[in-house]
Amino acid sequence: MKKKLVLAMAAAMAITSCAVPAFASDDAAGGGKIGISMPTQSLERWNRDGSYLEEQFKAAGYDVELTYSDNETDRQVNDIQNLISDGVDLLVVAAIDGEALNTVMDEAKDAGIPVISYDRLIKSDAVSYYISFDNYTVGTLQGQYVIDTLDLDNAGDKTYNIEFTAGDPADNNAGYFFNGAYDTLKPYLDAGTLNVVSGQTDFDSVATAQWDTQTALERMQNILASYY
């Protein structure tokens, strides 16, 4: 049954429009219990994702335990351990820190519980599936939006100032987002059409711990006060 649960979950998450049929196809297998570990409720997307997954699993006849860990890695480890102790048949985990869950992932593996790494990569061989976007392409689309909005290909002698803000270094996706955007904009930076007045163009300089909006705001306020 666990294998069927994993395959149903992977199919449903990869093809959203087919979510209900994918779950329903295994409903006759007798259901099971799903443990979902989300990073935080402070960002709307995780509320949305957690609620959606819970709704779809319940509609297909599965019991669901949904946890949010308030962006605290130790709390997420504890939440996952509790889900394992509660005897879930499948874990869906959106990691706060993809490198901090190895021990608890091993616990899940030892208990015979498949794990789906949801959106953020968990670097452990205990993970059965990884579901995410093409994150580099997401970054290129962000960069292309800047190009199109400012009409950079027809800028002539016009120049524009730009500053970068990136995501959490602990999130595997953040580097791909940044690299996709930066690589797309680099020709315009090299040509001088775009200028980074602060000089902060490497990922480590522009990253934002835990994707915290207040931290990003304060950094940008400091840049504006110091360089503009």
Model-derived regions: residue spans:
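A residue-level marker of the well-folded mature domains of exported/periplasmic proteins
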Residues: 2-4, 8, 22-228
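Hydrophobic core
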Residues: 9, 13-18
